[in-house]
């Protein structure tokens, strides 16, 4: 259930966003961009944008809300939804739904758990989901891009080839994860094909406005922007639940405590969040904390739920 203050109405979104942006601008210590992906390391950590999309597609924004950025792990939400729509509960035989507690690219748990990743949002789990979507579609990254273009209404969304190449050049840990899971029979496609799809997936550039709109199906309980159903209401609930418990790497507990919404972050500095039945949000600021989440992004979402009174608790 979403709890909202009695006086809250959608027309107040814009002044709330402007107040948040003003507070963020005056906040020192904004973290550091991801430096292990060279193409992201040059981002200015003080950039900031935030957008809110209502269920009918009305969007409010502030700051750099129309500036495209590297979506990175945010795309894991959409590949999860696309695969879940195709194969349903069979997916959960190959990936779990539990928080990891370890870094997002850790190999440690995989060995203890026989090649079954803890959840779909750590890198190992995301590789499994992309692998299964590749088997289903023949072009996982292309299917994802087509979906994001349709839901955002932006046909110009595209892959950033420089980011994809940068990730491939520094992707030894992901390659190790892929080969390790393949040794347990939990990867169907060749690891090089899988990695190419995964790196392209993570390289998609989109703005806060694009991603807030694209996430709308989760606030509409599985209904896409065109009115067709992607997920059952139960499946949409499942995706939101996994976002809440696993969506911000090993800081999910703190994110739930501070923000109180399902969310998914990426090392490009973006975070999406869902208010079921009401709206979706995306915030971007490239400076990250030690766990890989946007410092200003988490702070902005914290302020949003505090100022508006929205929460899933």
Curated annotation (Swiss-Prot):
Q: Does the keyword Heme apply?
A: no
State if Oxidoreductase is listed as a keyword: no
**Which Pfam families does the UniProt entry name for this protein?**
Glutaminase
Q: Which reaction does this enzyme catalyse, per its entry?
A: L-glutamine + H2O = L-glutamate + NH4(+)
EC number(s): the record gives 3.5.1.2
User: Which keywords belong to this entry?
Assistant: Hydrolase
Question: Tell me, what is one Gene Ontology molecular-function annotation carried by this entry?
Answer: glutaminase activity
Residue sites binding substrate per the record: 73, 123, 167, 174, 198, 249, 267
**Single GO BP term:** glutamine catabolic process
- Tell me its family: Belongs to the glutaminase family.
HAMAP family (UniProt xref): Glutaminase
Subunit record text: Homotetramer.
Q: Under which name does UniProt file this protein?
A: Glutaminase
Q: Which organism is it from?
A: Streptomyces avermitilis (strain ATCC 31267 / DSM 46492 / JCM 5070 / NBRC 14893 / NCIMB 12804 / NRRL 8165 / MA-4680)
Identify the coding gene.
glsA
